[in-house]
Amino acid sequence: MAREFSLEKTRNIGIMAHIDAGKTTTTERILFYTGRVHKIGEVHEGAATMDWMEQEQERGITITSAATTAQWKGHRINIIDTPGHVDFTVEVERSLRVLDGAITVLDAQSGVEPQTETVWRQATTYGVPRIVFVNKMDKIGADFLYSVKTLHDRLQANAHPVQLPIGAEDQFSGIIDLVEMCAYHYHDELGKNIERIDIPEEYRDMAEEYHNKLIEAVAELDEELMMKYLEGEEITTEELKAAIRKATISVEFFPVFCGSAFKNKGVQLLLDGVVDYLPSPVDIPAIRGVVPDTEEEVTREASDDAPFAALAFKIMTDPYVGKLTFIRVYSGTLDSGSYVMNTTKGKRERIGRLLQMHANHRQEISKVYAGDIAAAVGLKDTTTGDTLCDEKHPVILESMQFPEPVISVAIEPKSKADQDKMSQALQKLQEEDPTFRAHTDPETGQTIISGMGELHLDIIVDRMRREFKVEANVGAPQVAYRETFRKSAQVEGKFIRQSGGRGQYGHVWIEFSPNERGKGFEFENAIVGGVVPKEYVPAVQAGLEEAMQNGVLAGYPVVDIKAKLFDGSYHDVDSSEMAFKIAASLALKNAATKCDPVLLEPIMKVEVVIPEEYLGDIMGDITSRRGRIEGMEARGNAQVVRAMVPMAEMFGYATSLRSNTQGRGTFSMVFDHYEEVPKNIADEIIKKNKGE
């Protein structure tokens, strides 16, 4: 199967936006105009082609990024749909990692919204060129120039219109092209009947003004164009297009388009913009990687002749073909049925079948080429972020960085039959989503699931019910407390049972003392003259370690203490390992009264990124959660607050931050260290655990 589209005519793009800006509808229209969908699916009716999971159709939000391929004017456009909800930012990060360019969709009434800020920041991190589509021009309150202003004010983006709308709200009837200096008039509802016309008289001055502003903005980034402009020479449409393309690809300039995807206006011109201004795989720097073992840095050029290298960016479980691994091919070619090396895991994998995905149906292909996005069937060990490559030319492409989960809840199956199904479901869901974790708590035996937010875990539990038919109860979030000693003391532990027949005799003196935080348990044998025989010393240590697991205050494990066995006695006949084990555990119990035990709690290192105007509220909120502010800094137009906050106070924080900042704040947290719980709070926890 020969290559259908050259690399220069391939575009890998994502569509990113705030929730409800009309991203899915825009994607739908692109698929409709590129001839991939025969009937347009409306999100309002829950039938969009890209939203293929049941829950997405119900909630009307896009959760997983489906990858679709479409064709426009001799170009192949691969589209990755990305979610717009805060809890799903990992999906967005994943998609951005494998894209060459993106369309940012704005709502013409709101302009740049909170989640737009977040995805824009992520796209800037990955250096993704963007064009902007101001959507919903037909909506009441639509204001194109206000939306462009929010790009400058909220994102400091060098964004300039390449189009102007003719009319707005229900009067929106056409678009002015500021590059070619002509206009397009729409005659029908489906937007298929477009007429190219001269710019209407009443818009001519405005068009002229914005045409000149566009040339000035682009000329600032292009010396040749600047010279021509200053000397008053005519700048041709081709020269202007080439200069916009160059500035867009170098992420110094963002062209702004307008339209209404719902009313089918402006989508074809947006597609022209994708072809004209967004990069092909050849236009972006070659991907970097390292050779396993030697750590030597290498690059992989976007070329079919280079050795094969690809990145797995998404795992999905498909009801018909099983596990699908979505891959972005950076270099070389790959045949179905061949073997590849997963260098991240160090395992060889066989590619069973290769599928090119259209949002709701799939087409089997025999080969993929550099620059392609496809789904592979049959990979067993590959997870998100892994590199697949030619066995003879191993490379590890830089992998994706995923944030640690920030919220945990206990989950238990409703019936015995659900137990096995639940562990299978959790394993599959973890493979698909690197920010979701599941583990069994050895102390309580409960299964604990952790994720990026409350909505994230809701959807996981929901998917377990729908896709894996597992019914489960979800508990309240839990904190892993610990206990330790503050004072040193010498304590006796005596276990003697002698009432006829074989007795039990174990007797120890142990000196307990606090150890440095994080150092764990240290045991020392200081017996002189065999008062406790050597063979019983390991039993003393084991007895202490077992007893420490159950705590002395509230049933939490004891950590960071030293124990020195310095005296004791034994009986020739009645002493045994068991007796000394019990004696040691009694010594630990007795230490509770003498060593001043305290509760420890996990302290999280929290970083909150918020617009300046919310700074006071957020700092007040952190302090009310027993947090200590460690520092602040400005990052662009946002403020970053760093603080240490007890884990117990962080429950519900994602939701509270979202409402305190209208969704414009984001936060991340990682475990830092354990610290003493204040006495009044510790007393409550101890009371609760003793069931008082």
From Swiss-Prot:
<dbReference type="InterPro" id="IPR000640">
    <property type="entry name" value="EFG_V-like"/>
</dbReference>
<dbReference type="InterPro" id="IPR009022">
    <property type="entry name" value="EFG_III"/>
</dbReference>
<protein>
    <recommendedName>
        <fullName>Elongation factor G</fullName>
    </recommendedName>
</protein>
<dbReference type="InterPro" id="IPR014721">
    <property type="entry name" value="Ribsml_uS5_D2-typ_fold_subgr"/>
</dbReference>
<dbReference type="InterPro" id="IPR004540">
    <property type="entry name" value="Transl_elong_EFG/EF2"/>
</dbReference>
<dbReference type="GO" id="GO:0005737">
    <property type="term" value="C:cytoplasm"/>
</dbReference>
<dbReference type="InterPro" id="IPR035647">
    <property type="entry name" value="EFG_III/V"/>
</dbReference>
<comment type="function">
    <text>Catalyzes the GTP-dependent ribosomal translocation step during translation elongation. During this step, the ribosome changes from the pre-translocational (PRE) to the post-translocational (POST) state as the newly formed A-site-bound peptidyl-tRNA and P-site-bound deacylated tRNA move to the P and E sites, respectively. Catalyzes the coordinated movement of the two tRNA molecules, the mRNA and conformational changes in the ribosome.</text>
</comment>
<dbReference type="InterPro" id="IPR031157">
    <property type="entry name" value="G_TR_CS"/>
</dbReference>
<dbReference type="GO" id="GO:0032790">
    <property type="term" value="P:ribosome disassembly"/>
</dbReference>
<feature type="binding site">
    <location>
        <begin position="135"/>
        <end position="138"/>
    </location>
    <ligand>
        <name>GTP</name>
    </ligand>
</feature>
<keyword id="KW-0342">GTP-binding</keyword>
<dbReference type="InterPro" id="IPR047872">
    <property type="entry name" value="EFG_IV"/>
</dbReference>
<dbReference type="InterPro" id="IPR000795">
    <property type="entry name" value="T_Tr_GTP-bd_dom"/>
</dbReference>
<dbReference type="Pfam" id="PF03144">
    <property type="entry name" value="GTP_EFTU_D2"/>
</dbReference>
<dbReference type="GO" id="GO:0005525">
    <property type="term" value="F:GTP binding"/>
</dbReference>
<comment type="similarity">
    <text>Belongs to the TRAFAC class translation factor GTPase superfamily. Classic translation factor GTPase family. EF-G/EF-2 subfamily.</text>
</comment>
<dbReference type="InterPro" id="IPR005517">
    <property type="entry name" value="Transl_elong_EFG/EF2_IV"/>
</dbReference>
<feature type="binding site">
    <location>
        <begin position="81"/>
        <end position="85"/>
    </location>
    <ligand>
        <name>GTP</name>
    </ligand>
</feature>
<dbReference type="InterPro" id="IPR027417">
    <property type="entry name" value="P-loop_NTPase"/>
</dbReference>
<keyword id="KW-0251">Elongation factor</keyword>
<keyword id="KW-0547">Nucleotide-binding</keyword>
<dbReference type="Pfam" id="PF00679">
    <property type="entry name" value="EFG_C"/>
</dbReference>
<dbReference type="InterPro" id="IPR009000">
    <property type="entry name" value="Transl_B-barrel_sf"/>
</dbReference>
<keyword id="KW-0648">Protein biosynthesis</keyword>
<keyword id="KW-0963">Cytoplasm</keyword>
<dbReference type="Pfam" id="PF03764">
    <property type="entry name" value="EFG_IV"/>
</dbReference>
<dbReference type="InterPro" id="IPR004161">
    <property type="entry name" value="EFTu-like_2"/>
</dbReference>
<feature type="domain" description="tr-type G">
    <location>
        <begin position="8"/>
        <end position="282"/>
    </location>
</feature>
<dbReference type="Pfam" id="PF00009">
    <property type="entry name" value="GTP_EFTU"/>
</dbReference>
<dbReference type="InterPro" id="IPR020568">
    <property type="entry name" value="Ribosomal_Su5_D2-typ_SF"/>
</dbReference>
<dbReference type="InterPro" id="IPR035649">
    <property type="entry name" value="EFG_V"/>
</dbReference>
<dbReference type="InterPro" id="IPR005225">
    <property type="entry name" value="Small_GTP-bd"/>
</dbReference>
<feature type="binding site">
    <location>
        <begin position="17"/>
        <end position="24"/>
    </location>
    <ligand>
        <name>GTP</name>
    </ligand>
</feature>
<dbReference type="GO" id="GO:0003746">
    <property type="term" value="F:translation elongation factor activity"/>
</dbReference>
<dbReference type="GO" id="GO:0003924">
    <property type="term" value="F:GTPase activity"/>
</dbReference>
<dbReference type="InterPro" id="IPR041095">
    <property type="entry name" value="EFG_II"/>
</dbReference>
<dbReference type="Pfam" id="PF14492">
    <property type="entry name" value="EFG_III"/>
</dbReference>
